[in-house]
């Protein structure tokens, strides 16, 4: 079977890893880095950029540079309305209430799944190059607290990217695989995973090849992005108080502020104070305005104190659900770049009574764990048993707007459970099954995963028909629901797809479009490389001509070469690629003999 890779599809950065020689290995990307920014951009020339290249141009192309999209995947527009207001790019609601990301350079709206798919495509392309073989299958990680909609949407993103997602695995569980792969002695570990946009806590028993999740808790709207936003708000308010200008109206200024806030946050993990320096942040009739602001670690912590406090509740909840106190935890493993914040490390130590284990790289450990899971599925790693849990309770709406739970949170998956229900009125011939996920008793307090109808129920007094509802959660944590009327045998079976916001046909259409753009992007890359090569070749030939190093070249030949260079330069300046190719080939034919004659033989 082809190599199966593990992908940590992160909010801020993404990582891909694979099993090499029996060991998990992080794959270096085309730019030479082990992490790839989860950023996608479309330039004014409609060129697609992903990762580091997209990040570099984000200030000058802020409205077409899309980052932190993972926070929107599998969500409805109303769920993220406040958060979307703080972004330099536009997030809109379509006619179905779904999230769309507006791309003005293409005059097109993208779903979050499509943007995430471009990040996955980049990771897969880098993996193919590194491994020297085709890659068509992957294990992708998600936050443990992702609901069914978000998990299904992640699978859809993989499909749009053109890969088969063999398994969805929870990020803390993946981290535990990486940490505990060689552990023989049983340990109870707490994984504290604070990334760019999400926060999870999982408690697991690890040892002798068995990884059993005891409990999980989290917050899918808490991460490093929120710390950055707290700093941006402080800078904006301070600047407005001093200068009377609101910088949030300026897209480029907002992007510069965001980048400066992230940089300052990272610096304060190592030093006690830093300076945020943003010259020419804006201008008015009196001239240019600048920001030069000192920020201490103490001030940063006070600005983010409410965010730090929010990290406390899931830890306490996970311990309670696992029926453990501090003494029951042997090791604490930190995951995610945001765990480098000293105040976070201090909080973890105070809650667990343990100094965090720093033997794993918090940026890479999840991808390594995903690669181990990929290796298990590909048969490259054996003797590993992974027992994960569902993070949230699942149930159906019953009379009075109440949620009746069929599967409780922290139930080991895969799992299948059934319960009998009946009709609420005499001679009722159909029932609507409203599937919910969450912990509240009332329907309105939970996430709606979808509705479907069971038709053809024989007429009978209310309460007599027996309708068996079965919930089946697979190893990816994705739910299928079956409703069956026992007397007639009428049955309706659905995988909860509506919650992912994309239909199967939409996913297929997006895959076709992504593949079409992949061809266009390849052509654009080839054109760009040709321009670079042709320009460099012109420079080299002109240098040789001017220094008299063109070998035995007649005056007529020199004149012909100069004319071709002139034609090629004109083609380059007008971006006439057909003419560039023709003139470049002509120039090489004319000059190769003379250039080679100036190079001594080896």
UniProtKB/Swiss-Prot annotation:
Keywords: ATP-binding, Chaperone, Chloroplast, Nucleotide-binding, Plastid
Record GO cellular component, one term: chloroplast
Keyword ATP-binding: yes
Record GO terms (molecular function): ATP binding; ATP hydrolysis activity; ATP-dependent protein folding chaperone; heat shock protein binding; protein folding chaperone; unfolded protein binding
UniProt KW Transmembrane helix keyword: no
Domain of life: Eukaryota
Gene3D superfamilies for the chain: 3.30.420.40, Actin, Chain A, domain 4 (3.90.640.10), Substrate Binding Domain Of DNAk, Chain A, domain 1 (2.60.34.10)
Places the protein is found: Plastid, Chloroplast
Pfam families (UniProt xref): HSP70 (PF00012)
GO biological process: chaperone cofactor-dependent protein refolding; iron-sulfur cluster assembly; protein refolding
Family according to the record: Belongs to the heat shock protein 70 family.
Function summary: Acts as a chaperone.
Protein name: Chaperone protein dnaK
Organism listed in the record: Thalassiosira pseudonana
